[in-house]
Every structure is written in structure tokens, then in C-alpha cells.
């Protein structure tokens, strides 16, 4: 049991590192590619890698039972919108702040679950979510770096859409193999990104820019790191309880800060640092009951 949990913890740490470095590569390419193009290149590379792996490690592609396609399509759309909003913010604001906005998903999950899942909202969870919302307000300061109304809106959207994707994943386990969900997400986002590149969308899609020689490396690294991150994330939740894994996911903000500083981001000021700290505390408090419950079983 302990070895399995240790393996799961190792996997989530690796996943967060991979997602962190993927975000750094996206920031590097953001000077040339639009957020929509980065979504497409990230997704199509991931799709090709998954198709190459499939013959060596096949899995069930068909659903276990009927009724899951709409849920899968919804997961693709909200997951794609979350990625698009996140990639936009990576281009415009510091990597740490963009990541912090995205990592607010558990806060929104707590607030949305009573309406979408008919779950009872506990007072402790509500207080924790409110602490996180204060953190969101603190990092949503227009006087800090380039955080304007559009960036704040995109940041909040990225967190909400990630939370909706997580909520949907709970149901999808009854219909599809985990690997099939990953492949469907990658393929669906490739299609959405491809179509989106031909549509002029302010801030998000500014036409098609043909990849230069030096861009091929970055595009490949974005796809590889994103694919590895998704695989490590899947294996983490397969081998260890979610109550133990979820709090560790917040190390992604640390990687966002470190990689951002390396790429030239300025260090967060006191107000933004406090906001990120409150978001971290909020997420940990939300996950604490499940974490303690799982630790007692060890």
C-alpha cells in the first residue's frame, strides 16, 4: 500500500514538472504563435504521440456503455477552453500568476458542486473557498505587471473550465478507459485548434503563422512534455488516493514561478505573493479532510 502511494506521489511530482516546463515552452513560442495556434500544435503533437504508442500498449476505445459521448464532448470543449485561456495568460502575464489562476479550479469545484452534482456544501469547504477567492482578488490587481481586465477574465475562466473538466471526469470513468479519454481530448482539441486558427478571434487567434525551423523544436517539446505530464497525472490518480494526490498538485505553481523567473518574469510583489499563498492554503484546506482520511488508512 505504502509503495503504491509513494509511486503515485512520485508520478504527480513528475507530472507537475512536465506541465511546468510545457508552460515555459508555450511562453517561449507565444511571441510568434497565437494562443489558438499553441493549442493546436500542443494537441496535434500529443495526438500523434498517443497514436504511435497505441500499437505497443493498446486499450479499449469504445465506451463501456451508452450515454457517455455527450459528457466526453463537453470535457473536450471545457478542457480546450481552459487551455486556450491559460495559454493566453501565459503570453500576457507572469507564468506564476497565470498558473495560480489556473490552479484555482478546486475553489470553483467547491462552489459549483452543489449545483452540478447536488452535493451538500460543507461550511469548512465554503470558508476555504472564500479564502481562495480573496487570493484571486489579490492577484487580480491591474497595477501589478500586465494584469488587466482581459487577463483577469481569462484567468477566472481558465480556473472555472478546469473545475468543470474535473467534475466531468468523475462521470467519464464509468464510460471510457482513461487512456481513451486522453486521446479523445487531444484529438478534439486538435480539431478545435485547427478550425480556430482560420477564425479571427481578438486576443486568441490572429491568423496562421508558418512554423520556422527553430519553432519545430519548441512545438515538439510542448507536445512531448504535455503528453508525459498527462500520462504521469493519470498514473498518479490510478496508484494513489485523490485525497493524497490533489494537495501535491499545487507544486505546479512553484514550477511556474521558477521557470517564469528563468525566462525573465519579475518576482511577485508582496500583494501577489500573498494572493498566491492564499490560493495555495485554500486548496490545501479543501483537500485536507480527504488527505487525513486516506492517511489514516495507511
Where on the chain are the PLM-derived regions?
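Membrane-interface interhelical linkers
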Residues: 1-14, 47-74, 123, 187, ...
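Juxtamembrane helix-entry segments on the extracytoplasmic side of multipass membrane proteins
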Residues: 4-7, 40, 64-68, 141-160, ...
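Hydrophobic/small/kink-forming positions within alpha-helical transmembrane segments
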Residues: 16-24, 51, 76-84, 106-111, ...
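Transmembrane alpha-helical segments that form core, pore/gating elements
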Residues: 24-27, 35, 50, 145-205, ...
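Structural signature of hydrophobic alpha-helical transmembrane segments
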Residues: 34-48, 88-105, 148-161, 212-226, ...
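Helix-helix packing/entry segments at the starts of transmembrane helices
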Residues: 41, 99-104, 172-188, 230-261
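C-terminal transmembrane-helix exit sites in multi-pass transporters
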Residues: 105-127, 254-273
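Hydrophobic transmembrane alpha-helices of multi-pass small-molecule transport proteins
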Residues: 124-141, 271-290
Amino acid at each position: 500500500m505504502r509503495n503504491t502511494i509513494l509511486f503515485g506521489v512520485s508520478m504527480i511530482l513528475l507530472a507537475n514538472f512536465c506541465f511546468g516546463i510545457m508552460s515555459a515552452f508555450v511562453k517561449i513560442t507565444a511571441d510568434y504563435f497565437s494562443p489558438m495556434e499553441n493549442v493546436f500544435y500542443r494537441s496535434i503533437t500529443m495526438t500523434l504521440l498517443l497514436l504511435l504508442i497505441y500499437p505497443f500498449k493498446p486499450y479499449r476505445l469504445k465506451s463501456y456503455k451508452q450515454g457517455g459521448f455527450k459528457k466526453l464532448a463537453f470535457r473536450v470543449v471545457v478542457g480546450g477552453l481552459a487551455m486556450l485561456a491559460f495559454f493566453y495568460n501565459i503570453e500576457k502575464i507572469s507564468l506564476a500568476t497565470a498558473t495560480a489562476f489556473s490552479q484555482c479550479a478546486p475553489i470553483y469545484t467547491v462552489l459549483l458542486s452543489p449545483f452540478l452534482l447536488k452535493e451538500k456544501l460543507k461550511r469548512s469547504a465554503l470558508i476555504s473557498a472564500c479564502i481562495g477567492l480573496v487570493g484571486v482578488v489579490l492577484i487580480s490587481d491591474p497595477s501589478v505587471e500586465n494584469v488587466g481586465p482581459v487577463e483577469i477574465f481569462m484567468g477566472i475562466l481558465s480556473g472555472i473550465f478546469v473545475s468543470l473538466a474535473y467534475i466531468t471526469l468523475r462521470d467519464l470513468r464509468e464510460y471510457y478507459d482513461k487512456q481513451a479519454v486522453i486521446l479523445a481530448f487531444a484529438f478534439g482539441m486538435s480539431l478545435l485548434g485547427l478550425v480556430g486558427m482560420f477564425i479571427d478571434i481578438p486576443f486568441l487567434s490572429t491568423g496562421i503563422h508558418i512554423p520556422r525551423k527553430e519553432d519545430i523544436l519548441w512545438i515538439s517539446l510542448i507536445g512531448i512534455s504535455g503528453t508525459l505530464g498527462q500520462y504521469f497525472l493519470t498514473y498518479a490518480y490510478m496508484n494513489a488516493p485523490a485525497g493524497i494526490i490533489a494537495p501535491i498538485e499545487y507544486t505546479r505553481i512553484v514550477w511556474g514561478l521558477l521557470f517564469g523567473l528563468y525566462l525573465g518574469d519579475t518576482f511577485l510583489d508582496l500583494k501577489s505573493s500573498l494572493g498566491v499563498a492564499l490560493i495555495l492554503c485554500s486548496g490545501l484546506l479543501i483537500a485536507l479532510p480527504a488527505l487525513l482520511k486516506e492517511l489514516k488508512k495507511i
